[in-house]
């Protein structure tokens, strides 16, 4: 069901949110091993964490500050805290997200 992750990752607790992910909690941050099926769209939203992510399979179409950026496999992106953004996934996509609490 969730991404192509090693068995140790698949033993982590599941994230209880609007997408599928395994969640690793650490002091001051969370690490999510997320999977998005093709056709997923997450509408504009904000959050109070400073987010960095790397695409490990597929592609993220990130809309932020009126600009659309395609983030491909192996590439990193950054979404600052409290900035409106949206995400679209045209193909099955896995990513590792780092959420840093302010």
Regions inferred by a protein language model and the residue ranges of each:
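Short acidic-glycine-tyrosine-enriched beta hairpin
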Residues: 66-81
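Ligand-binding loop in jelly-roll beta-barrel domains
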Residues: 81-102
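Glycine- and acidic-residue-biased ligand/ion/polar-headgroup-sensing regions
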Residues: 49-60, 65
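A cytosolic small-molecule/anion-sensing beta-strand core signal
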Residues: 56-57, 72-73, 91
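A short, N-terminal "cap"/entry segment at the start of jelly-roll beta-barrel domains
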Residues: 1-28, 32-33
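Conserved short histidine dyad/triad with adjacent acidic residue
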Residues: 30-47
């Amino acid at each position: 069901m969730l991404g192509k992750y090693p068995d140790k990752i698949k033993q982590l607790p599941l994230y209880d949110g609007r997408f599928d992910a395994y969640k690793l909690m650490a002091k001051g941050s969370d690490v999510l091993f997320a999977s998005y099926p093709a056709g997923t769209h997450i509408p504009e939203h904000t959050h109070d964490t400073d987010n960095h992510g790397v695409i490990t399979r597929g592609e993220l179409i990130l809309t932020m500050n009126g600009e659309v950026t395609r983030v491909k496999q192996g590439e990193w992106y950054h979404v600052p805290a409290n900035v409106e953004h949206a995400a679209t996934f045209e193909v099955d996509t896995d990513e590792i997200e780092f959420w840093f609490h302010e």
